[in-house]
């Protein structure tokens, strides 16, 4: 990864980088290399954003990364990040607290905001008050803005990979294009629902576990309506 980043430096002025988005990492050593590079990018462009998807685990699966990564995300990546996009399980890991209710989630977000990130998107949230056929996303800002959107929860067998990556990328893209927190959340959730619906349809026909991002690409471009019913 050092060689890849060195190659990028040779062909790109770091001041032209508007954002750095990270997801799954193999180990904390890779994370340290990324944060070192991030320091150089922010020195060249102080307005550049670091969007961190702290991939560590999920409800029902537990932790599925190496043992050094949870403390890396909690103690190093969180203070460096401008935007974080944990799922409910990861939100609990980052704060050391159970997240079972909406109030728990708000309190956990506040705890993370206090470490540095000004925007948090909880990419999946199932609280005690959530119906089994629904799932929520929560967007929070350090200015105490909180928005929740609840959408249908589709069942998959097997579960497709990459939904968190897609959600983070969409949300970051909307923010970088000037949408406010509420608008970015709504636009992200609308597209995710359409991708999941298309994925569900294809899985029923073929058994594929791949997200249908190609088949649903018109919703990314805005060529089709993606309004929630």
What are these regions (language model features)?
Residues 5, 9-12, 38, 42-45, ...:
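Structural signal for hydrophobic packing residues in well-ordered secondary-structure cores
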Residues 26, 56-58, 90, 125-128, ...:
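Glycine-rich beta-alpha junction loops
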Residues 182-229:
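Charged C-terminal helix
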């Amino acid at each position: 990864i050092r060689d890849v980043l060195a190659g990028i430096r040779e062909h790109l002025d770091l001041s032209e980088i508007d954002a750095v988005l990270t997801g799954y990492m193999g180990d904390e050593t890779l994370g340290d290399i990324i944060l070192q590079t991030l320091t150089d990018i922010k020195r060249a462009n102080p307005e550049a954003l670091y969007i961190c998807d702290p991939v560590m685990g999920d409800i029902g699966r537990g932790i599925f990364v190496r043992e050094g990564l949870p403390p890396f995300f909690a103690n190093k990546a969180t203070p460096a990040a401008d935007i974080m996009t944990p799922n409910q399980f990861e939100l609990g890991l980052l704060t050391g607290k159970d997240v079972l209710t909406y109030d728990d989630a708000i309190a956990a977000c506040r705890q993370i905001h206090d470490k540095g990130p000004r925007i948090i998107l909880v990419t999946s949230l199932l609280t005690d008050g959530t119906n089994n056929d629904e799932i929520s996303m929560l967007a929070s800002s350090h200015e105490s803005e909180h928005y929740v959107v609840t959408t249908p929860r589709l069942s998959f067998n097997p579960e497709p990979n990459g939904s968190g990556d897609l959600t983070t990328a969409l949300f970051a893209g909307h923010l970088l294009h000037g949408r406010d927190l509420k608008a970015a959340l709504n636009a992200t959730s609308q597209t995710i629902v359409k991708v999941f619906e298309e994925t569900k349809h294809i899985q029923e026909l073929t058994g594929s576990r791949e997200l249908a991002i190609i088949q649903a690409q018109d919703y990314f471009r805005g060529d089709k309506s993606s309004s929630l019913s």
